[in-house]
Curated annotation (Swiss-Prot):
Motif 'KMSKS' region: where in chain: 271-275
CDD domains (alphabetical): Anticodon_Ia_Cys, CysRS_core
NCBIfam families linked: cysS
A molecular-function term among this protein's GO annotations: zinc ion binding
Protein name: Cysteine--tRNA ligase
Keyword Repressor among record annotations: no
Residue span of motif 'HIGH' region: 32-42
Cofactor(s) for this UniProt protein: Zn(2+)
SMART domains per UniProt: DALR_2
Cofactor descriptive note: Binds 1 zinc ion per subunit.
Residues annotated as binding ATP: 274
Disulfide cross-links: none
Family statement drawn from the similarity comment of this UniProt entry: Belongs to the class-I aminoacyl-tRNA synthetase family.
Length: 465
C-alpha cells in the first residue's frame, strides 16, 4: 500500500504523512460553538474529519482524536440573555442536539471532546507564560492582548504579512491595543455579563479569548507538539494563525506538523453563512432527505473543494446511493476479512492515501457495484460493503434503505402497509387476468414514488424512488 499523503496548508503542498511517534497519530479539530443548531457547514466539517480519523485507523494507526466544544463565547452569552436562560442550560441543550445530529450522520464520537469551560486554569497558565515570554500585555481596558509583532513567524500559515494585514484587513479600532492587529487572550468582565460568563484571574474577572481556548486544550490533551490540526477553511486566518502564535510563543517549539482545512459549503456560488441568510440546519435537511444521503452528498466531493448545496445535488446523491444499495439487494456477501491485495481494495486505498480523495474512492465503489450487478459474486459484494463501510456508508440492510428511501422526506407518503395492500390488489388483478387493472396499480404506485419489481416465483418487491 502506498504511503498516506495529505495536503498541508502550512507547506502549501501534499506531503507524505510521518507521525511524530511511529504508529500513533494525535489529531485536534476545532469543533462547534454551541448556541444554535448545527448547519450544513458544520456537517461537512464533522463528516470530513470523521473520514480522516476512520482512514487513519483503517491503515493501522492508533489515533487520539480530540474535537473541542466552545461553550463560552460572546454569541453564546447574547443568546442566553435573549432567551432568559443560563449559559449552561443553553450550551447543554445544543450540545445534546449536536450529538443527535452526529449520530444521524454516522459520525463516530471523538476520543476526547473537551469543553472550553473545563480548561480555564490551563488557558490562564498559557496566558501567564506568554506574558512572561514577552508576547502578552494587559491593556488599559483590562483585556490581556497578544502582541503580534513580537512573534517573528506571524502569518506563516495564511501567507499574510503584518504589513499586508495592516494595509488590507479590516481591524476594529481599539485605542487600548498597542497594535490594531493584536488579539485578545483574556477579556475583562463587563458589569452586565450574566452568571457563568467570567472567572477569577490575576488579571481580574474575565473570560478567555476564542483563540487561546484551542491552544490550551490542544497542548494539554495532545502535548505541546502534535501531528494534525484540522478545521474549516474559514478558520485558517485568524483563528489557526493565532493558535500557532500563542502555542509556539508559550512553548518555544513547533505546535503542529500538518494543518488540514476543509472547503466552504456554497449556495449559488456564495459561501453558506448565517449573515447571508442562505444556510440550512442539519435538521432542516433531514426533514427532506435520509441522513445517509446527506453523508454521501458530502463524501463524494473532495474535502478541500467547495461543496455546492442544492436540492438537485442531494437528489442526485440519493439516486447514486440507491444504485449502490440496489447492487447489494439480492447478493449475500461472504464473511471473509478485507484483503488489501484485492484489486478494488488497492485502488480504493490508493485514492484515500492521495489526500483522502473520496471522489475517486467513490468511483471505485461504483465500478465494484457494476461488477456485483453483472456477476452477483459474494466476494465482490463483501468488498463493496467493506470499502463503503470505511466511508461510513452502506451499513444498512439494502431492502430497508430502498423501501425507506429518503426517510422523513416521505412523511405523508404511502406507508409500507398501504403499499403492500396495493401490491396484493395487483396480484389479485393479475390472477383474475385483469392486466389493465394490474398495470394501473403499478403506474399509480410509480406516480407515488414506488417502483415494483416482479421476481421469479410470483413475488413482488418494491422500493421508493
Amino acid at each position: 500500500m502506498e504511503s498516506l499523503r495529505i495536503y498541508n496548508t502550512l507547506a502549501r503542498d501534499k506531503q507524505v504523512f510521518v507521525p511524530r511517534q511511529p504508529g500513533e497519530v494525535r489529531m485536534y479539530v476545532c469543533g462547534i460553538t454551541v448556541y444554535d443548531y448545527c448547519h450544513v457547514g458544520h456537517a461537512r466539517m464533522l463528516v470530513v474529519f470523521d473520514l480522516v480519523q476512520r482512514w487513519l485507523r483503517a491503515i493501522g494507526y492508533r489515533v487520539t482524536y480530540v474535537r473541542n466544544i466552545t461553550d463560552v463565547d460572546d454569541k453564546i452569552i447574547r443568546r442566553a440573555v435573549e432567551n432568559g436562560e443560563s449559559i449552561k442550560s443553553l450550551t447543554d441543550r445544543f450540545i445534546g442536539a449536536m450529538h443527535d445530529d452526529e449520530a444521524a450522520l454516522g459520525i463516530q464520537r471523538p476520543d476526547i471532546e473537551p469543553r472550553a469551560t473545563q480548561f480555564i486554569p490551563q488557558m490562564l497558565g498559557m496566558i501567564e507564560q506568554l506574558e512572561a515570554n514577552g508576547y502578552a500585555y494587559q491593556a488599559s481596558d483590562g483585556d490581556v492582548n497578544y502582541s503580534v509583532r513580537k512573534f517573528a513567524n506571524y502569518g506563516k500559515l495564511s501567507g499574510k504579512s503584518l504589513d499586508d494585514l495592516r494595509a488590507g484587513e479590516r481591524v476594529a479600532a481599539n485605542d487600548a491595543k498597542e497594535d490594531p492587529l493584536d488579539f485578545v487572550l483574556w477579556k475583562r468582565a463587563k458589569a452586565e455579563d450574566p452568571e457563568g460568563a467570567s472567572w477569577a484571574s490575576k488579571y481580574g474577572m474575565g473570560r478567555p479569548g476564542w483563540h487561546i481556548e484551542c491552544s490550551a486544550m490542544g497542548c494539554t490533551l495532545l502535548g505541546e507538539h502534535f501531528d494534525i490540526h484540522g478545521g474549516g477553511q474559514d478558520l485558517q486566518f485568524p483563528h489557526h494563525e493565532n493558535e500557532i502564535a500563542q502555542s509556539e510563543g508559550a512553548t518555544g517549539q513547533t505546535f503542529v506538523n500538518y494543518w488540514m482545512h476543509n472547503g466552504f459549503v456554497q449556495v449559488d456560488n456564495e459561501k453558506m453563512s448565517k449573515s447571508l441568510g442562505n444556510f440550512f440546519t442539519i435538521r432542516e435537511v433531514l426533514e427532506r432527505y435520509d441522513a445517509e444521503v446527506m453523508r454521501f452528498f458530502i463524501v463524494r466531493t473532495h474535502y478541500r473543494s467547495p461543496l455546492n448545496y442544492s436540492d438537485v445535488h442531494l437528489d442526485d446523491a440519493r439516486a447514486s446511493l440507491t444504485r449502490l444499495y440496489t447492487a447489494l439487494k439480492d447478493v449475500e456477501p461472504d464473511a471473509l476479512a478485507l484483503d488489501w491485495n484485492e484489486p478494488y481494495a488497492q485502488r480504493f486505498a490508493a485514492a484515500m492515501n492521495d489526500d483522502i480523495n473520496t471522489p475517486v474512492a467513490v468511483a471505485t465503489l461504483f465500478e465494484l457495484a457494476g461488477e456485483v450487478n453483472r456477476t452477483r459474486d459474494a466476494s465482490l459484494a463483501r468488498q463493496l460493503k467493506q470499502l463503503a463501510g470505511l466511508l461510513g456508508l452502506l451499513g444498512r440492510e439494502p431492502r430497508a434503505f430502498l423501501q425507506q428511501g429518503a426517510g422523513s422526506a416521505h412523511a405523508g407518503a404511502l406507508a409500507a402497509d398501504e403499499i403492500e395492500a396495493r401490491i396484493a390488489a395487483r396480484v389479485a388483478a393479475k390472477q383474475a387476468k385483469d392486466y389493465a387493472e394490474a398495470d394501473r396499480i403499478r403506474a399509480e404506485l410509480l406516480e407515488a414514488g414506488i417502483a415494483l419489481e416482479d421476481k421469479p416465483g410470483g413475488s413482488t418487491e418494491w422500493r421508493r424512488v
